């Protein structure tokens, strides 16, 4: 059962009830929680585009608590984060793993945060193939190309040499918030929201 809290606001014109995500959107906050698939990506992309059209001078806050998911869905979010004019601040609470950590790192440099007990995990993309040998070969080439593309972006976003990224993403690589800061995945570990601009 998916329970979404409702917030009631009072105004001179009476009461208005919002689901919690709509209320957060009024404050330019987008929640990315759970596995990243096409539906989640479409929702996040629509919210990014809406907030940017509303005011491209104000920052957008993307809160992440995700185990990762689809590479293509995640890259669609990544491209949209770069496409919008507004700066996108990223904040991990809980976990940012796999594509979740990739999107955390995609935030505006200087505005990528983690709460003290957050976990961040990077690794290479996962995939599988079946069918004729030629189809398997095509799929294998595609996942190797995808790995190279993701590693190149991570190297650029973290400042780490590509060889270090390749080594460190070869297996699941878990980091604390402090370790993620030292690595360059985030810019600050924050205790409270006063660090946000």
Swiss-Prot record:
GO CC annotations on file: cytoplasm; endopeptidase Clp complex
Gene3D superfamilies: 2-enoyl-CoA Hydratase, Chain A, domain 1
Record bears the keyword Hydrolase: yes
Keywords of this entry: Cytoplasm, Hydrolase, Protease, Serine protease
One term of GO molecular function: ATP-dependent peptidase activity
EC number assigned by the record: 3.4.21.92
Localization, UniProt: Cytoplasm
CDD domains assigned: S14_ClpP_2
Active site feature: 98 (nucleophile), 123
BP GO annotations: protein quality control for misfolded or incompletely synthesized proteins
Listed InterPro entries: ClpP (IPR001907), ClpP/crotonase-like_dom_sf (IPR029045), ClpP/TepA (IPR023562), ClpP_His_AS (IPR033135), ClpP_Ser_AS (IPR018215)
Pfam families, per database record: CLP_protease
Main localization category: cytoplasm
Catalysis: reaction(s): Hydrolysis of proteins to small peptides in the presence of ATP and magnesium. alpha-casein is the usual test substrate. In the absence of ATP, only oligopeptides shorter than five residues are hydrolyzed (such as succinyl-Leu-Tyr-|-NHMec, and Leu-Tyr-Leu-|-Tyr-Trp, in which cleavage of the -Tyr-|-Leu- and -Tyr-|-Trp bonds also occurs)
Sequence similarity: Belongs to the peptidase S14 family.
Quaternary state and interactors: Fourteen ClpP subunits assemble into 2 heptameric rings which stack back to back to give a disk-like structure with a central cavity, resembling the structure of eukaryotic proteasomes.
Function: Cleaves peptides in various proteins in a process that requires ATP hydrolysis. Has a chymotrypsin-like activity. Plays a major role in the degradation of misfolded proteins.
Entry protein name: ATP-dependent Clp protease proteolytic subunit
Gene name per UniProt: clpP
